[in-house]
Amino acid sequence: MAGIGTGGTIMGTGRRLKVYNPDIQIIGVQPAYPFHGIEGLKHIESSIKPGIFDETFLDRTIFVETEPAYEMTKRLAREEGILAGQSCGAALHAALELAKELEEGVIVVIFPDGGEKYLTTAPYKDL
């Protein structure tokens, strides 16, 4: 599971993982709305699609609203000591929602971005 920004991380990592295990599911995370505050992620339907991105490769896409992404980013910092970007908060929120649907399995979430460059922005300014 990874956020969809340029598409490079989810496409490259996903393709390589499928070589090792064709049954693995590749799940993308993107903002629920065109106008959002989740840095690093694209709302694909309203954006110019990056050339590397192939929507048909994904097994599923989970849409996340801005506030839950911000809240999860704050929780990562407060509870786990992980300074991550908002796209990471969105991806973790989506993973936890997915986990509620599963009886068993393993969910791997890619955190591609640190939070140091966002310290003066939401969600960190409220910490």
Regions found by a protein language model. Give the residues of each.
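Glycine-rich ThDP/TPP pyrophosphate-binding loop and its adjacent helix/strand module
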Residues: 1-24, 100
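Short glycine/serine/threonine-rich phosphate/pyrophosphate-binding segments
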Residues: 3-14, 87-95, 118
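Surface-exposed, flexible loop/turn segments at secondary-structure boundaries
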Residues: 8, 34, 69, 115-116
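Active-site/ligand-binding loops adjacent to catalytic centers
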Residues: 18-86, 101, 122-127
